Amino acid sequence: MKLVHNAKKALYIFVAKYFRFWANISLRRWHPRIIAITGSVGKTTMLHLTETQFDHDAHYSHFANSAFGVAFDIVGLRGVTTSKWRWLYLFIAVPVRSFFYTHTEDFYIVEIDGERPRETTLLAEWLKPEVTIWVSLGRSHAVYYDKLVASGAFANVDDAIAYEFASLARHAKKLVIIDGASKLMQQQTEKIDAKVIAVSKSALRAYHVRPESTTFEMTSGDFTFHDPMPMENYLQLAMLEELMQYLGRDITHDLRSFIVPVGRNHFLRGAHGVKLIDSTYNAHLISMKSMVNMLSEMKIAHKWAVIGDMVEQGASEAEEHTKLGELLADSDFEQIVLVGRRVTQYTLPVIEQDGRHTVVSFTKTQDALDYLQQHLKGEETVLFKGSQYLEWVVEKLLADPTDTAFLARQDKAARKRRATWGLN
């Protein structure tokens, strides 16, 4: 089994380097100023925030954050989203396009994931960004790092993930911006060559949030959004302030036209007056805390939470879901609806033992929808966070069916996968 795993890993790296070799021809011809954004959560929101400031002066890796995807993006291609035969096309098209396709923007703002060990490092060694923005650090894909910890390479999964993300800091040429509250980020950037700026909560002067809007009073001015934004987004805004100051560019503060990435804390109107906050794109403890804290800041009645499993937690699964139970037990939700095997097994007992909340759990997503349709009266604000295709539940509760455009996993492949769960 280990031999097969190592063979797959070697093949992955070989193929990634193949595409990197060809895409680099186009990149060298383009020669943009590269700003890399990485972290466990919040990368895509940070990418979208930079777009509000740079507009057409930059190209953004909206559909790519992996070793393969970034190479495809540089030559103007998308990765494999449907047929696997597209791999054959890409093996031919990437070399061909590398000789004639060139982006023209001054900046390349690229989102980089750390899902697999060595993936961030491969991109860091290649791109060598002028600026690295390290947004966050958490156990987003912990399952992929368990073997590194078991081998003795790292003391724990947190150290392993931090080291991988830090490769972008180690290879940054000029500037690295980090969360000053993270000791691991500070440790990993102590001896790097680039200048390090650690942002802190002192940059946030005040925070006001409602289901339909948010205002952050920051050092440079007040940022206004038309969606509910977690308080933790002050970090991205503070990082944005530091980036714009470094580049000598003016900041746009009115962000009411800003559209949050799909499945991230988006406000949607539900049937019969119910207010829906869709944050179903992903879920790990760090993002769960962020959204629960956001709801706690809202001075409104009848707060509900629909919480699904946190996947890809590996050996940390029980621990992380138990902590989730403690988080929810301390919240001010009027009703908590749990959906999935993991939250039923680990999270539910913690909330029940606390005894302060009305809580129900379901292992089937359809049963959760049935419960909501029977019990929602129209005065509730409902947070959706977690796996188990909760975006399908949101879809069924929408007042305007066209708002499915704002939901995650709406492509044909995703709809086909959820259909196997009986969710049509």
What are the language-model segments listed below?
Residues K2-F19, W30, K43, D55-H56, ...:
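ATP-dependent carboxylate-amine ligase
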Residues N24-R29, D55-Y163:
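ATP-dependent carboxylate-amine ligase catalytic core
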Residues W30-P32, T104-E105, A124-K275, I300-A301, ...:
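Acidic, Mg2+-coordinating active-site environments of NTP-dependent enzymes
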Residues V41-T45, G114, Y234, Q388:
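Residue-level detector of alpha-helix initiation sites
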Residues F63-S66, S136-R139, K201-L204, V360-A368, ...:
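Short, acidic/turn-prone active-site loops that include or flank metal/cofactor-
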Residues D113-P117, S182-K183, N282-A283, T365-Q366:
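Short beta->alpha connector loops
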